[in-house]
């Protein structure tokens, strides 16, 4: 961990994770002391996503997942961490970082010309594609209860050269816009 900046209200850190072949992760993060300032929200909870926790059930071991809206280029999914995380805001932020890696691949993958093969022929996604997160950014706007249902609403911005970009907003059930996520994703067709 490298200390990049220590200010009165902001600090910045850089982390490089390495394995035998070199760097596998470069992380830059900034932290801010809470400030009582204006709170203006322009984004709104979409009207087409139903009630928190409603939708088609696709639960995972650690996450409750409800598909609220899925179409070409868009995935809106209610997510909730199954365990009680308590009131620690850092633990809540870490849990959101963990959950935010899921939905961007759905939105970009839905635009791929071969995605129907995966759905119609009951073939596993990994049998057709190789995927990875290339770049991932999160902006935390407001306090968030990750052990409650949060709507992750992501839209694909395109897919070219085996890379896609997804940008999404995360909303609390109250409609509060709690975070914004952007992710560049590798979606490469398997050749063997």
Label the model's feature ranges.
Residues 2-192:
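Terminal targeting signals and extreme-terminal segments of soluble enzymes
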């Amino acid at each position: 961990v490298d200390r990049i900046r220590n200010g009165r209200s902001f600090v910045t850190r850089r982390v490089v994770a390495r394995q035998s072949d070199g760097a596998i992760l470069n992380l830059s993060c900034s932290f801010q002391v809470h400030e009582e300032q204006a709170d203006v929200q322009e984004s709104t909870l979409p009207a087409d996503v139903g009630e928190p926790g409603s939708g088609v059930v696709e639960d995972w071991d650690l996450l409750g997942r409800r598909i609220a809206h899925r179409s070409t280029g868009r995935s809106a999914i209610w997510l909730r961490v199954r365990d009680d995380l308590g009131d620690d805001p850092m633990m809540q932020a870490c849990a959101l970082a963990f959950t935010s890696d899921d939905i961007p691949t759905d939105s970009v993958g839905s635009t791929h010309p071969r995605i129907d093969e995966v759905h119609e022929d009951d073939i596993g996604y990994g049998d057709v594609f190789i995927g990875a997160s290339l770049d991932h950014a999160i902006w935390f706007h407001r306090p968030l209860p990750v052990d409650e249902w949060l709507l992750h609403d992501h839209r694909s911005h395109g897919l070219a050269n085996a890379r896609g970009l997804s940008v999404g907003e995360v909303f609390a059930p109250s409609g509060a816009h709690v975070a914004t996520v952007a992710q560049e994703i590798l979606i490469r067709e398997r050749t063997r």
